[in-house]
Swiss-Prot record, chain A:
Subunit (UniProt): Component of the multisubunit TRAPP (transport protein particle) complex, which includes at least TRAPPC2, TRAPPC2L, TRAPPC3, TRAPPC3L, TRAPPC4, TRAPPC5, TRAPPC8, TRAPPC9, TRAPPC10, TRAPPC11 and TRAPPC12. Interacts with the heterodimer TRAPPC3-TRAPPC6A.
Species this chain originates from: Mus musculus (Mouse)
Subcellular location: Cytoplasm, Perinuclear region; Endoplasmic reticulum; Golgi apparatus
Protein family according to the UniProt entry: Belongs to the TRAPP small subunits family. Sedlin subfamily.
An example Gene Ontology CC term for this record: TRAPPIII protein complex
A single BP term in Gene Ontology: COPII vesicle coating
Listed name of the protein: Trafficking protein particle complex subunit 2-like protein
Role this protein plays: May play a role in vesicular transport from endoplasmic reticulum to Golgi.
Keywords per UniProt: Cytoplasm, Endoplasmic reticulum, ER-Golgi transport, Golgi apparatus, Transport
Presence of the UniProt keyword Transport in the record: yes
Domain of life of the native organism: Eukaryota
CDD domains: TRAPPC2L
Gene3D superfamilies per UniProt: 3.30.450.70
Curated annotation (Swiss-Prot), chain B:
Compositional bias (Basic and acidic residues): 901-911
Comp. bias regions, Low complexity: 1201-1214
Name of protein: Trafficking protein particle complex subunit 10
Source species of the chain: Mus musculus (Mouse)
Region (Disordered): 888-913, 1201-1222
InterPro entries hit by this protein: Ig_TRAPPC10, TRAPP_II_complex_TRAPPC10_C, TRAPPC10/Trs130, TRAPPC10/Trs130_N
UniProt xrefs under Pfam families: Ig_TRAPPC10, TRAPPC10, TRAPPC10_1st
Keywords: ER-Golgi transport, Golgi apparatus, Phosphoprotein, Transport
UniProt subunit comment: Specific component of the multisubunit TRAPP II complex, which includes at least TRAPPC1, TRAPPC2, TRAPPC3, TRAPPC4, TRAPPC5, TRAPPC6A/B, TRAPPC9, TRAPPC10 and TRAPPC14. TRAPPC9, TRAPPC10 and TRAPPC14 are specific subunits of the TRAPP II complex. Interacts with TRAPPC14.
Predominant place of localization: Golgi
GO cellular component terms attached to this protein's record: cytoplasm; TRAPPII protein complex
Family, as annotated: Belongs to the TRAPPC10 family.
Residues found modified as Phosphoserine: 707
Amino acid sequence: MAVCIAVIAKENYPLYIRSTPTESELKFHYMVHTSLDVVDEKISAMGKALVDQRELYLGLLYPTEDYKVYGYVTNSKVKFVMVVDSSNTALRDNEIRSMFRKLHNSYTDVMCNPFYNPGDRIQSRAFDTMVTSMMIQVC
Amino acid sequence: MDAPEEPQPPVVYTMENKPIVTCAGDQNLFTSIYPTLSQQLPREPMEWRRSYGRAPKMIHLESNFVQFKEELLPKEGNKALLTFPFLHIYWTECCDTEVYKATVKDDLTKWQNVLKAHSSVDWLIVVVENDAKKKNKTNILPRTSIVDKIRNDFCNKQSDRCVVLSDPLKDSSRTQESWNAFLTKLRTLLLMSFTKNLGKFEDDMRTLREKRTEPGWSFCEYFMVQEELAFVFEMLQQFEDALVQYDELDALFSQYVVNFGAGDGANWLTFFCQPVKSWNGLVLRKPIDMEKRELIQKQEATLLDLRSYLFSRQCTLLLFLQRPWEVAQRALELLHSCVQELKLLEVSVPPGALDCWVFLSCLEVLQRIEGCCDRAQIDSNIAHMVGLWSYAMEKLKSLGYLCGLVSEKGPNSEDLNRTVDLLAGLGAERPETANTAQSPYKKLQEALSSVEAFEKHYLDLSHATIEMYTSIGRIRSAKLVGKDLAEFYMRKRSPQKAEMYLQGALKNYLAEGWALPVTHTRKQLAECQKHLGQMENYLQTSSLLASDHHLTEEERKYFCQEILSFASQQEDNPGHKVVLPMQFARLKDLHFDPPNAVVHAGGVLTVEITVCSQMPIPVHVDQIAVNVHFSIEKNNYRKTAEWLTKHKTSNGIITFPAEASLFPASQNSLPALELSEMLERSPSDNSLNTTGIICRNVHMLLRRQESGSSLEPPSGLALEDGAHVLRCSSVTLQPGANKIAFKTQAKEPGTYTLRQLRASVGPVWFVLAHIHPIVQYDVYSQEPQLHVEPLADSLLAGIPQKVKFTVTTGHYTVKNGDSLQLSNVEAMLILCQAENRAVVYSNSREECSTALLRIQSSDKVTSIGLPTAPAYHVIEFELEVLSLPSAPASGGDTSVPGTPELHRKQKDSQRAGHCMVTTDHKVSIDCPWSIYSTVIALTFSVPFRTEHSLLSAGTRKYVQVCVQNLSELDFELSDSNLEDKGHATDLRLAPLNTQSQQLIHSKQSVFFVWELTWTQEPPPPLHCQFSVGFSPASEEQLTVSLKPYTYEFQVENFFTLYSVRAEILPASGAEYCKTGSLCSLEVSITRLADLLDVDKDEALVESEDYFSTKLMYEVVDNSSNWAVCGKSCGVIAMPLAAQATHRVHMEVMPLFAGYLPLPDVRLFKYLPHHSAHASQLDADSWIENDSLSVDKHLDDQLDCSSLRSRGSTHSTSSSEHKGLPMPRLQALPAGQVFNSSTGMQVLVIPSQDDHVLEVSVT
């Protein structure tokens, strides 16, 4: 499954970012941050079409030798970025899509929490558990 | 028919390949036609319908015409498609039956037999007709016969296999037609053949593919078969279809690799797992890389070979399809997947070999694309290429690190060996690029050859990549590459070049709030700055890093120690200051004592701040200081008081907002929306035009975000100089919260603003440039003040009231013997009580002491001795004052009580309703601190309001006085008395009040009644004064005697002159009045006295021996119980004699059943219009009277008079009414008319059928 999952605010600062293994955390931070370039590009390229078709999934942002970075953007321009190991060939587009949808649902739940301040870092345990379930378990 | 044993040599695969069509028969004929044929055939496209539901395509056909040979026909099992003859044509121009029978028929038969033997059914016989030939031979058969014969002989059921081409070399319309028919036929047959043969081929191929699970199946064999199909499609210019073949092969192979990874290995795949020995990259410059193809054919290809070949074919086709950007994209995918596949298949690869392969391939793809696109195209599609650039750069970098080209000392022998091995794997340069100077091969070889060359190539690549990223707006990617470059520079010991890139990247990360990259980059920057010797920057970065929680404890300690050791080193160099922004510590809150942060001059103020140190270890600070800005503001106290309620918590603690460094500053510093509603009204009629919400701080919200320049505070911080500094020396800041208290004695009055917080460690000064929100304290100096205010809401006149004196000493110190001198006012007494105490409070409202007041009164002055009190204290005491009721007015003007001023107020207040009458007393006070007197006005309210009224019972008269208590207090009334002021001897007032003492509650009234008797008729006017003693009901004992409350009034004309009596009688014969039926109303007006003085007015008519006066009566029923039928009013002449009675009869109709009150009968004096001056007056009085009633009376008048004119002979009066002078009505004074039937009721019973009663009264 995913090795890094990030939720990024409209203003491009991370609301939530988790990666595994933790040693390469920094690398993933750089990777996710860089991928925002492509996210921005795709959003502006899609422009109105995106709004009309309500297609939130941005697809593969860019592949690297070892990882594939996928993107997803909500209507409020909150971005989800997921990094998947390239060697994990079992993950097809459809699986990625459904993972994003799951992530989006969980994020919506977080936003619905009246005690959550939009724009704050996400510290919800439920969200954390969900993300954990989508990441590789390092044993 | 012996077929040659040797397999046919491979055809040269170039784009010149065309489908093969064989020609048999008359070769000379064909040669003559060939140029036209080859030119005409591709001219028009033909629709190719495809099997398997594939979309039909328009296709331009071309053919390679070759002479028919039996060897050309494929043998059984030969899968070659490129050499496959798709159509066989036999040419003849025979027109002679004899010749046909002799030679042509045999030849045709032989040809047909060969075709049949190879089961080829795609053939065509062309008969060329030539008019010229026909003319030569006269006995020729009709031309059709030869064709018929051929058709008959060879084309059984397939007559379309024989076509006629007439005069092919002429330029006539018939020729054209015949050509067209022929070409169409030829194209159709060719396509039929394609469909059939390709279909068959595809079927075979599919069959072969389905066998892939069988053990002996070989991917390479299958590859060659499917590629054959791809070739044919390519030959037919169907590049899309050709590409599909390769994509299918690609997918098939990829799937096998994936399956292999999942443990499902195919035997043939193990062959591809042989160790990589050659990594010479992709070759894209030839349409077909025959070397690699041969390797595949021989089943000797490695994974990289297969992939390279496959991609080179895909690349070629994509370029034919004008899709170069897809090449770039696919190339990147290919390179990534190859690396992955090699890993997955666990192929042994020498270190660096793949890097070489990827590097070469990237450059090869880029060069290939650049070779076929122009500059503009490339520039607009950088986004597709930049990935390859950055990949190539990455690989070159890792090669550089691998071969020791990045290290300072250069490569060692081990590195060199590795380099040699890598170069060996490249093999020799390929011939097609040998002459290109910038070939990937040469580049790589050069880059690996020396440290300098590597640096050059690496920098070239990096800069190109950064430039490309920047140009397409991928700033983040550009920054990341820049950071890599910075790392490279750091290794090359050129930190000055690295700094720029690090700063750029750091700014980017800070702006977007990415904590981890910020920390990492900052760490690199710190190292860079240290190398550069930028001490201030380094210390600043260090202080940031020392307080960065993303670093380990050790790292933070290290950076903290760096600062401290710098500080200790520089101690011997006094005067040199290093000013740094304070980032290691955060100001958390600030606490003032006194809490309101207001202190009087000379007072002591304490400021306690809480500073959160983020340092990992305790830091000893030489001094902590707060720079204070002083400004003189005159209105400081009030401003501060207002400000306090707004900004400061009541406990004097100011909390500074936590700056979460995680979020970008742009996010934090944005103020909240300040929305307010906006209504815009039209200026003319004030109607609402627009409404909306406006944002008041748009300028704050929408201003352009400075691109992070303000995020990293500029190092050029200045220490503010100022005389006012709060200091605290030698403080050790522990990690976490530290409380530091500053104490200061206030000096000059004014506002002090806390500006800078700074902490010094040796020569290092940490400065918090601005304390935000603004923190201020105020020092004030106050003039002494005296306040006098009533203790209750309002002071009541007549009873003792408490007044509070407040002396605010300000800067004045009250000495022993200081006193307030109050000038006495006549009507206000200051009551001196024995137990008056003064209380002294401190500035913060704490009670200090109490003292007895010394009050000394003289005639004019009351002196109050003040207790001693220090400056900025408050003395409070209370005094009782009594406002005496104003002296009763003397003399003849007795109708007006009190002073004129008072009277006016009374009038006003009566009009306003229940307001109390007030009197003001002005007291002038001399204070010891001032030479001027203070004048204080005290307002007292009279608690009562009094009204009188005259009551009649026949001829007996009563005076009623109503006293209303308007205050909130209850009073006890006593000794009520009504006294005739006129001292008329023949008038007597007999009180009917029993109680001498009476309680009057708040907002309630008490009535007093006296009967008025007189001895002489008519009685004179009564002028009297009402007085009543009062005291507050709650007070038990009053020390002073209170003056009674008085009220003066006058009663006149109270003698009864007329008695009115009304009676309602049922209709004659009826027992009761009934609703709806007429009843009679009898009104009798009786004169009770003879002519009196009061009757002597204009209405008086003197005729012969008796006097009469004119009266008007009017029957009014305000409650609509009665309908008056006929006229309701009339004028009567009343004789002025005792017991003279006038009776009026009227008809009224009850409208309701029940006990109904009688209608009112009103009596007016009817004044005629005698004189001109009277009429003038009249006009005024008409107006002054209720105009509505005037009109009404006028109508009545007319009505009455017309009626009267019928009854009597007063015809003149009617004409007079039209003139301007009109008669007027005057109400009789209340006492003169007594209505004896007031309050009487009459019983009305409902009529039997009065469910609905309609009465219309006109």
